[in-house]
Amino acid sequence: MKNILKKQIYWRIPLAFSLLTSSCSDYLDKLPENTVEVEGIDYTNKSNMYMPVSGVYATARGYLGSWSSYGCIIVRGDDVNKGGSPTDQIEYEYASKFQYDRLTTFWALSGLWGNCYYVVSTSNSALESLENYAKHLTSESDKQLNAQYAAEVRFFRAYAYFQLVNLFGDVPLLLDNQELNVFKNTKEDVKKYIYDELDYCIANLPAIRPNESEHPGAVTKYTAEMLKAKQKMYDNEWDEVLALTEDIVNSGKFELYNDFYELFKIPGKLCNESLLEYQFTDFGNGSGDIVSSDNWFAFQGPRGEAPISGWAFIEPTEKIRNLFSKRGESVRAETTFLMTDATTRDGDYIPVAQPGEPTAYNGKAYTPANQMTPGRTGYGDNNNIRVFRYADVLLMNAEAKVRKGQNGDAPLNLVRERAGLAPIANATLDQILEERQVELALEWGERFFDLVRTDRATQELPGFVKGESEYYPIPQDQIDLNPNLEAEPVPFEPEVTE
């Protein structure tokens, strides 16, 4: 695909969305509407109380899992090249070189901003619906369930703000979908808001794995703890990182999936390593209804014949490939790098690249043809997008221990053992950070954020300027719609409820 249709999506803050009815009784049982109904509902019928929650899951997987947004998130690390043909979506190349002055009108960056706020807006509406249901509940068990559902929604609102604050810095906290001409809030206030939201989630979500939920894959207490730990890690607050990750580890609920190759493919969907996935399904049918990833997999797929065919973006850099080779990686290399002019163990031939295009692709987005439902031809159909993994929890735990003068060998070596590597004794911080670099390569910009938080970005990323390159600029179309976004951030003043 030489040129991708640019979906010019313009989002205004405030957001005035038309919120229509969601027909989802379970967030994978029917096609998502990506919407939440607020008016015209019988709030006395508690059997429908999960409907607004399912709408938020549908919105999150469609918008937080957007392929164009993912490109903006992942492309700034030294493990990723833009890929694609040399001139296609050249703005991703500018982003990787931190030439932000060339991105102010980039449609995908505006889409990233808007996608996050769409999740916020949908969450706000869902919470309004849940409050209306709560007014008619009498039993404690029903009230507790309502609080759990609210916590599921608030998790995704917190995650949207997690993306916004780490990608853009100072951003508005939108608490009311009717707010007009909002100002930015400080990064510190946004992070505090995220922590407060996640504390509510931790207190009200069940202490189970996502695959143990009544709605399989739903977020749980441990998903919220992991998100909070990640933000605390970015803020170098290691006491809390240790406490949060210890709670997850000591729960005994999670384990590393035994096959790294299959972890990112159909057999690894919602395994015991998973803390968060965006879920998709073809319902086991070769045609007809499908809950699709809307090209997240195709964006990173190789040039080739369907169903192993995509747009050739997101290329592993020579730097990360050399590191894998130097370390003697074989298990993780086979999975992470989908090499051209080669045949995978599942028998899919990956053609030679066109001149100027990638010689390897993101293997973590590869779904073998023999695992797809017969009749389906879309690259990655019926696979899930992995977002949070237990391996990351173990590595955060190991790093927190070492930073606090403790021994982090045990969690680190669990990850290394799965990769077929020898254990390390008395692991150093540098060894743990390199393990993160390899284990989490080509996943959600983890490498970039690790370099920033450890103050190594200037050393490792050509063009990175400390104090300037950490955050994307707010898209110009958003500033045109709301000039207050150019003003200095204001203190956050939460509403006080009596």
Q: Each predicted region: which residue ranges?
A:
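Membrane-proximal, proline-rich intrinsically disordered regions
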Residues: C24-V75, T245, P475, E486-E498
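Flexible, polar/acidic helix-loop-strand segments at domain edges
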Residues: Y94-Y100, N322-R389
